[in-house]
Amino acid sequence: MARFLLLLVAVAAAAAVLSLGDAAPSTAEVFWRAVLPESPLPDAFLRLLRPDTSFVVGKAEAAGGAARTGFPFDYTDYRGSDSPTTASGLDLAGDFGEPAPFGYDYSAQGEGGGGGAAAAAGEQVLAVDAGFNYDKYVGARKLRGGSSTAGGENDDEPFGYDYKAPSSGSGTAASTTARGVGTGATTTVFFHEEAVRVGERLPFYFPAATTSALGFLPRRVADSIPFTAAALPAVLALFGVAPDTAEAAGMRETLRTCEWPTLAGESKFCATSLEALVEGAMAALGTRDIAALASTLPRGGAPLQAYAVRAVLPVEGAGFVACHDQAYPYTVYRCHTTGPARAYMVEMEGDGGGDGGEAVTVATVCHTNTSRWNPEHVSFKLLGTKPGGSPVCHLMPYGHIVWAKNVKSSTA
């Protein structure tokens, strides 16, 4: 225990030093600029390397980033299950089966996976008043110990999509229609690749950015803290997190997700420091010649408004690595290969939404081979397609990142 107390002091001291801002770049920042000289540090990473002093207000508050709210979307879980699952297909109540590579469901493809009443080709898909989530599979209320029953109230999970196949008694409405909250305004969720072209208009709502309480820890500190499910009780004590809290549930889910074995055809890893994140992406892509692609979005979010596509810059390559921040007191990223895909950097300009137009750039991934996806995946129902059909596209929200190798861009 004495060792963990010393680590806690080191964590708090490191965060306090980092909070001094631009006085001196961190070791991780120097590392990034040395190995990725042509890739600017994403704004989210700068925030995580230089967290606010208000984040370090005691052990309990320091763990406050473990259970974040308002993450309604998930674009990486394609398997089916009758039980709530974690990112790697783990049943939160116990293991229930082996997930397939990339999270796809390798079971026999059923008939009628396309959902004939969905939107026509070329149209974006709309859902009701919410932001984006790429890695939460059971909603924020579930992490806090609340009910995640379909149709129940869920103030923190505006869309309430569960990206598993619906159980036999759930019907299709809950898995194909968003649960409305707030104003009932609409925002784009999935869209066809045809929408990624100059002149198209897509409605988006961007929620305010959230970060882990301590941000990126110095690598030496992160490597000193056990990152295993077996060590979770000691880590909870280290950060002053009670075992029966939402924070503990979020941390437990993150650890179980990261510890799930790598499957054939899949490359995945979890990174607890910026250096480990970069090195992991290099290993997954098989080269040190990589570049980071991140959306440029306002930290404070932006109200729902129509965005006109002004430029589309294709990114060379057919496979990428996507990384999503996880629930933990300090920054942890879960990364995975995307499978066959095309990527774009899409420049858009908002019409104002009452607050004046704002230019944004969104990293966009279009999955080009969905033949192994679960036929009940909600994107098929919303887009009116089926496994093996037209590409399924989505953007990467603030703080998420796509890695590519030998990146070159040209205006489309």
Swiss-Prot record:
GO BP term (any one): pollen maturation
Gene, per the UniProt record: BURP13
GO cellular component: exine
Keyword Nucleus recorded: no
Alphabetized PROSITE patterns for the sequence: BURP
InterPro entries: BURP, BURP_dom
Name of this protein: BURP domain-containing protein 13
Traits of the deletion mutant: Collapsed pollen with low viability. Almost no seed production.
Residues making up the signal peptide according to the UniProt record: 1-23
Organism: Oryza sativa subsp. japonica (Rice)
Keyword rRNA-binding assigned: no
Keywords: Glycoprotein, Signal
BURP domain ranges (all copies): 190-406
Lineage: Eukaryota, Viridiplantae, Streptophyta, Embryophyta, Tracheophyta
Role according to the record: Required for pollen development. Probably synthesized in the tapetum, packaged in Ubisch bodies and transported at appropriate stages to the micropsores.
Tissue: Specifically expressed in anthers, in the tapetum and microspores (at protein level).
Entry-listed glycosylation sites: 369
